[in-house]
């Protein structure tokens, strides 16, 4: 028993709520299954008969499904609880994948491809983002920044690192179709760990005599009832514009200065490796220096500066691989400066944390549309330099907006006391930690 308590103490000290550790492990395994198709599914479908436009439309439909699912995940958790919401996400992924792989791809029937892949797209936000909402409810405020940092570490590690790494070996060994089927093993294993091994009890703040439809509508109305939450959603949308926009035009721009596709891919991959490490670091920094200050200076200002540096460095010094690698890594680190936003937003709406997290998750989805849209609209008339300045200006604007995301001391004290009481009732681990 002492060994178990010791492990719980260690996990809490590094920022992982010990009573939710199996949920974190479940998320990373689930996201491996979701991310294993990155980089090769579109070329595979084109090789089997789709046009490039049809493939682009397929992924656009998928993105729409992801955005809607992400937006609603928080209010679903607040209304029905995280286990039910995550179970719906797991089933959507499994059913959508089965239809997509087992029937739509063999027949290459385009409407079926659109519908089944969109159903699959509903899955991971309902699963992963609902767990993030769960974390925001069940974690003490003094480690909440680190706790959400660990969530984004697990999420990104599975989606952008382990998933593609696994498929780089699985596709040559088993083929594309069997690799897609293997995703179900990962999501099932992750689902079992997060839903059944994770013993935390969820206790949402209940509203008396409020119909469920009104609770669900909070995902939209909270942005007007609490403008700070709406501002936070805008900041979150700006967060990843570089992540979704750079890949469209930077490789072509860098090629003018002698950077090969291979060098670009190495720089891009290393950027995200640094990012997942700094997700944890800036989670801890946010708990020490303040969530708002971390997002504003390290996230907004940092991303703005290194966005400009990525563009101007090749012009100033030409082909210098390691210099550009260092700058890209600095951008990846600054990108993680936005991590405390996941702790800040639910604290701005202590009575509607689920709705606040829905707005945060909506921002996560919207940037996947807005960034390519900016590139497509302005790359022609303004060129790469114009797009870079638009991105940098948006990052600096997000830093300005973050100034308004203030929390009153009174709300913070009430929230901390509520968290303290709930955790002592819920888990033996936290009871030990608090003693």
From Swiss-Prot:
Extracellular domain ranges by topology: 35-56, 107-112, 164-176, 250-264, 315-320, 376
Gene Ontology CC, one term: plasma membrane
Cleaved signal peptide residues: none
InterPro entries: MFS, MFS_dom, MFS_trans_sf, Polyol_permease-like
Compartment annotation: Cell membrane
Regions that span the bilayer: 14-34, 57-77, 86-106, 113-133, 143-163, 177-197, 229-249, 265-285, 294-314, 321-341, 355-375, 377-397
GO MF annotation, one: transmembrane transporter activity
Its membrane topology: Multi-pass membrane protein
Keyword terms, alphabetized: Cell membrane, Membrane, Transmembrane, Transmembrane helix, Transport
Pfam family, one: MFS_1
Keyword Glycosyltransferase: no
Membrane side Cytoplasmic: residue ranges: 1-13, 78-85, 134-142, 198-228, 286-293, 342-354, 398-435
Keyword Transport set for record: yes
Family: Belongs to the major facilitator superfamily. Sugar transporter (TC 2.A.1.1) family. CsbX subfamily.
Protein name in the entry: Alpha-ketoglutarate permease
Species this chain originates from: Bacillus subtilis (strain 168)
Higher taxonomy: Bacteria, Bacillati, Bacillota, Bacilli, Bacillales
């Amino acid at each position: 028993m002492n060994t178990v308590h010791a492990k719980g103490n260690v996990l809490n000290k590094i920022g992982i709520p010990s009573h939710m550790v199996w949920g974190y492990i479940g998320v990373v395994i689930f996201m491996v299954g979701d991310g294993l198709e990155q980089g090769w599914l579109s070329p595979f479908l084109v090789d089997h008969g789709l046009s490039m436009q049809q493939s682009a439309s397929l992924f656009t439909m998928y993105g729409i499904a992801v955005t809607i699912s992400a937006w609603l995940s928080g209010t679903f958790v607040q209304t029905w609880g995280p286990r039910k919401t995550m179970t719906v996400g797991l089933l959507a992924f499994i059913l959508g994948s089965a239809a997509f792989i087992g029937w739509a791809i063999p027949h290459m029937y385009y409407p079926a491809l659109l519908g089944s892949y969109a159903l699959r797209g509903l899955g991971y936000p309902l699963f992963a983002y609902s767990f993030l909402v769960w974390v925001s409810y069940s974690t003490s405020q003094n480690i909440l920044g680190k706790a959400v940092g660990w969530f984004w570490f697990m999420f990104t590690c599975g989606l952008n690192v382990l998933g593609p790494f696994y498929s780089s070996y699985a596709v040559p060994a088993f083929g594309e179709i069997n690799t897609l089927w293997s995703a179900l093993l990962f999501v099932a294993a992750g689902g079992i760990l997060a839903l059944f091994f994770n013993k935390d009890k969820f206790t949402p703040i209940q509203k008396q005599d409020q119909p469920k439809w009104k609770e669900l509508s909070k995902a939209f109305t909270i942005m007007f009832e609490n403008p700070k939450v709406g501002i936070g959603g805008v900041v979150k949308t700006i967060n990843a514009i570089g992540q979704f926009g750079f890949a469209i035009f930077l490789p072509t721009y860098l090629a003018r200065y002698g950077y090969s596709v291979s060098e670009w891919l190495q720089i891009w991959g290393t950027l995200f490796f640094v990012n997942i490490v700094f997700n944890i670091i800036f989670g801890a920094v946010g708990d020490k220096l303040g969530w708002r200050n971390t997002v504003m200076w390290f996230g907004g200002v940092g991303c703005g500066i290194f966005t400009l540096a990525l563009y101007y460095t090749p012009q100033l010094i030409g082909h210098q691989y390691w210099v550009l690698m260092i700058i890209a890594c600095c951008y990846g680190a600054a990108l993680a400066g936005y991590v405390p936003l996941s702790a800040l937003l639910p604290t701005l709406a202590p009575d509607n944390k689920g709705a606040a997290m829905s707005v945060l998750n909506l921002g996560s989805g919207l940037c996947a549309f807005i960034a390519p849209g900016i590139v497509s609209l302005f790359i022609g008339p303004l060129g790469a330099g114009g797009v870079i300045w638009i991105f940098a200006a948006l990052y600096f604007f997000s830093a300005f907006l973050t100034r308004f995301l203030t929390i009153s001391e009174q709300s913070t004290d009430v929230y901390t006391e509520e968290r303290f009481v709930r955790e002592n009732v819920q888990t033996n681990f936290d009871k030990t930690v608090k003693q």
